[in-house]
Amino acid sequence: MAKYIFVTGGVVSGLGKGITASSIGVLLKASGLNVFMQKFDPYLNVDPGTMSPYQHGEVFVTTDGAETDLDLGHYERFIDENLTKESNITSGRIYKNVIEKERRGEYDGGTVQVVPHVTNEIKKKVYHAASTSKADIIITEIGGTVGDIESLPFIEAIRQVRMEQGRENVIYMHVSLVPYIAASKESKTKPTQHSVRELLSLGIQPDIVVARTEQALDDNVLEKIALFCNIEKSNVLVATDVASILWSHKMYEQNAQIVISKLLNLKSLKTDMSEWKRFVEKINQSQQVIEIKLVGKYIELPDAYLSVSESLRIAGYENKVKIKIDWIKAEDVNKKNDQQLLKNAKGILVPGGFDERGFEGRGFEGKILACQFARENNIPFFGICFGMQAAVIEFARNVCHIQDANSSELTETKNAIIDIIRGKDKTDALGGTLRLGNYKTTFVPNTLAHKLYGKKWGFRTSRHRYEVNNDYREQLAQAGLVFSGLYVEKNLVEVIEIPKYPFYLAAQYHPEFTSRPNKPNPLFNGFVQAVIKNK
């Protein structure tokens, strides 16, 4: 029988509920338990696939093709498990299911209400995750902040879960802000007290409070939180401002796994954190700083490229260097200033992104110039998704001399080097129209991609609708572009490279989704190694 941990947040958003949940997942997995993680998001979008990166940050794609919240990237990196579409449930999806059932007459003409129909649908998703994953522990993060009107059905649903499953099978963990007031040199517990009081008014008594704070908290503060939150002092955990990847180690040092095992009546846990300790050692050994220029469209919100930046840092630690990212807005790069913006670059990365007709000036030409600068100056280059398409178009224009080479996604052109995938008809719809999830990529022998992966093929995660136009492949290949990774079944290009350069490679899929702290993605690892050699 599965046991459940629900993680809520209070006072303000952005406190690190996802990192907290992930860290707990690490501890429990290191204790020999099977863990499954999911997140409930209160917004009414069916999924985040059509949301602006400025609103939502990165869209993380699971192997089964679900477009999900960026927190799932944290979950997968921390617990080293591939999650599924059942790991991210939105209010939009819940209400859509309820309305569809009502239209089919499944409620026998009854009045459809938030309680019990919406809450039952939410609980169904929790229990379905338990039955399909066969996990020992289901960790569920509730998005938003306690008290938000949008999250009330989820709070009510998880209250009912404890009633149905029993106190020894359910834990409520609450992450709350404990601000430090510099003027008085005090840590204030009042916001947390009020947040827990709000939670109590909704029928939930938290079992563990995670105090999110800038400064370490002394015993007096911990005792005060415990007193006013009705919990033992040992059940107050502290999360200070450290690198997110270190949170699990900090939780381990506070015996979070012991607290959880007592609350859930688990057998005595033997937690082996040796793998994470090795990773922490790598971080501590990484002193040299290497700068990589990332030329992207949404750099004002770095969370839009969260998995990319995390993958770079992980690869850096693997090679005992710290990666510093120089964020360059693609829209700012033009022929007058590209030399200035990109000079002294040791490595250039152009990540994914989307654009639309009439807005091709919003960054795409800047990405093309970045690709050209890297190629002409023999700078290690790595392109991802839209970044690969930019690299192919740049090569077509400046090496093959196809001056009007472009993407049909952006503009009408006689030479659509990038065109819509056959079978993906053009449509005004946005949601659910992409090539999503894992597809088998075959690597061409004696290429850089084949060397880096060390295998003939593998499944890679895609999120796109446009591809290299096969009508131009022969011309591009004759000019020196190598198509080193292919989806053979439909003859689609997945990886390109230029062999005469130390590292000039781009992938149509998203390698950043598969990096793990002790297992950097091979393409990121190879790119960072090339940058180190170029320093």
UniProtKB/Swiss-Prot annotation:
It catalyses: UTP + L-glutamine + ATP + H2O = CTP + L-glutamate + ADP + phosphate + 2 H(+); L-glutamine + H2O = L-glutamate + NH4(+); UTP + NH4(+) + ATP = CTP + ADP + phosphate + 2 H(+). GO terms for biological process: 'de novo' CTP biosynthetic process; pyrimidine nucleobase biosynthetic process. GO terms for cellular component: cytosol. Gene3D superfamilies: 3.40.50.880, P-loop containing nucleotide triphosphate hydrolases. L-glutamine binds at Y54, G353, F386, G387, M388, Q389, E409, R465. The active site is at C385, H510, E512. Residues 1-266 are annotated as: Amidoligase domain. One of its GO terms (molecular function) is glutaminase activity. SUPFAM superfamilies: Class I glutamine amidotransferase-like, P-loop containing nucleoside triphosphate hydrolases. PANTHER family: CTP SYNTHASE, CTP SYNTHASE-RELATED. NCBIfam families: PRK05380.1, PyrG. This is CTP synthase.
